[in-house]
Curated annotation (Swiss-Prot):
<keyword id="KW-0812">Transmembrane</keyword>
<comment type="similarity">
    <text>Belongs to the Ycf4 family.</text>
</comment>
<comment type="function">
    <text>Seems to be required for the assembly of the photosystem I complex.</text>
</comment>
<dbReference type="GO" id="GO:0009522">
    <property type="term" value="C:photosystem I"/>
</dbReference>
<keyword id="KW-0934">Plastid</keyword>
<dbReference type="InterPro" id="IPR003359">
    <property type="entry name" value="PSI_Ycf4_assembly"/>
</dbReference>
<feature type="transmembrane region" description="Helical">
    <location>
        <begin position="63"/>
        <end position="85"/>
    </location>
</feature>
<dbReference type="GO" id="GO:0009535">
    <property type="term" value="C:chloroplast thylakoid membrane"/>
</dbReference>
<protein>
    <recommendedName>
        <fullName>Photosystem I assembly protein Ycf4</fullName>
    </recommendedName>
</protein>
<keyword id="KW-0793">Thylakoid</keyword>
<keyword id="KW-1133">Transmembrane helix</keyword>
<dbReference type="Pfam" id="PF02392">
    <property type="entry name" value="Ycf4"/>
</dbReference>
<feature type="transmembrane region" description="Helical">
    <location>
        <begin position="21"/>
        <end position="43"/>
    </location>
</feature>
<keyword id="KW-0472">Membrane</keyword>
<keyword id="KW-0602">Photosynthesis</keyword>
<dbReference type="GO" id="GO:0015979">
    <property type="term" value="P:photosynthesis"/>
</dbReference>
<keyword id="KW-0150">Chloroplast</keyword>
Length: 184
């Protein structure tokens, strides 16, 4: 969802709360729980999973390795669930022509850098830069080129905008900010 008026443009950025992250976290949790359960059942010699008897899987080395994979998968799943609950990467880009300020805000992981906030003057914006790399790993990213600061990405690398959508977004933003467009 974006909001735009004559002098202010606010673009909201989705973070970790995407359907794909929910799916991966859920699948990883189920799979790693299964691996850990098989490892524990082979260690104890009891049948916790009715698909096969525990005597078919020896604890050393198969049960031990499956337990390790299960524990590692649970840690990765917990990391994904934490990133989803904290909504890491979400935020907004606010372009305010009235005040002459660009504000970029993102949520990070808890700690010192939980709130990531950048503020620049519009007069310091050199250009809007489009980076297009086609091939097996396509990459289409929109950057805000700031004098003395370098380039700041405005779109995520996994956003998958078509070249036409990318050009349209860059043209609208460049027109709004009254800066040129560069293509790399």
């Amino acid at each position: 969802m974006n909001w735009r008026s004559e002098r202010i443009w606010v673009e909201f950025i989705t973070g970790s709360r995407k359907i794909s992250n929910f799916c991966w976290a859920f699948i990883l949790f189920l799979g790693s729980s299964g691996f850990l359960l098989v490892g524990i059942s082979s260690y104890l010699g009891k049948n916790f999973i009715s698909l096969f008897p525990p005597q078919q899987i020896l604890f050393f080395p198969q049960g031990l390795v499956m337990s390790f994979y299960g524990i590692a998968g649970l840690f990765i799943s917990a990391y994904l669930w934490c990133a989803i609950s904290w909504n890491v990467g979400s935020g907004y880009d606010r372009f305010d022509r009235k005040e002459g300020i660009v504000c970029i805000f993102r949520w990070g992981f808890p700690g010192k850098n939980r709130r990531i906030f950048f503020r620049y003057l519009i007069k310091d914006i050199q250009s809007i830069r489009i980076e297009l790399k086609e091939g097996i790993y396509t990459r289409r990213v929109l950057y805000l080129e700031i004098r003395g600061q370098g380039a700041i990405p405005l779109t995520r690398t996994d956003e998958n905008l078509t070249p036409r959508e990318m050009e349209q977004k860059a043209a609208e933003l460049a027109y709004f900010l009254r800066v040129p467009i560069e293509v790399f």
